[in-house]
Amino acid sequence: MYVELVDETGQVPSEIIEQTKEVLAFAAKKLDLKESTEMSVTFVDNARSHELNLQYRETDRPTDVISLEYKPDESEFFFDEDMELPEELLEEMDPFIGELFISIDKAAEQAADYGHSIEREYGWLAVHGFLHINGYDHYTPEEESEMFALQEEILTAYGLTR
């Protein structure tokens, strides 16, 4: 999987950037995503996170991670509006699945609050957002149980334990 990483803050250590790429590639293998899959991750500060959270979620505060899932639109590729294509074909034509915005301020706060390493927190946020992009959610107790168990399984197997 290809992950484009952007550090808008200029403060994220190169080790965290590499770890983020690696843990997302690891998670992609766990979900059996194609190697051609692409996504982006942008590290932002709380001010930018607040702005994005307001824009996309209509929530007036900063947040730790924002996940924007991308679904290819048939109209981008074909002129015949009546033509329906299998989702697999659309995914092959446009392998971009979404983007994450991770707040470095929230990552630092939460690592301290939860008493684990900053590496673990960045990994947690990246995998959490990645799972959202891939259809997982936590609106119900059942969804939360499934998503958080998978998230913990990925992080533990990768080596980011508490």
Curated annotation (Swiss-Prot):
The record's free-text note on cofactor binding: Binds 1 zinc ion.
Keywords: Cytoplasm, Endonuclease, Hydrolase, Metal-binding, Nuclease, Ribosome biogenesis, rRNA processing, Zinc
Cofactor requirements of the protein: Zn(2+)
An example molecular function term from Gene Ontology annotations: metalloendopeptidase activity
E.C. code: 3.1.-.-
Principal location listed in the UniProt entry: cytoplasm
One Gene Ontology term, aspect cellular component: cytoplasm
Binding-site positions, Zn(2+): 128, 132, 138
Pfam families: YbeY (PF02130)
Subcellular localization: Cytoplasm
Annotated GO biological process: rRNA processing
This protein's record includes keyword rRNA processing: yes
HAMAP family: Endoribonucl_YbeY
Function, as annotated: Single strand-specific metallo-endoribonuclease involved in late-stage 70S ribosome quality control and in maturation of the 3' terminus of the 16S rRNA.
Family (UniProt): Belongs to the endoribonuclease YbeY family.
UniProt name for this protein: Endoribonuclease YbeY
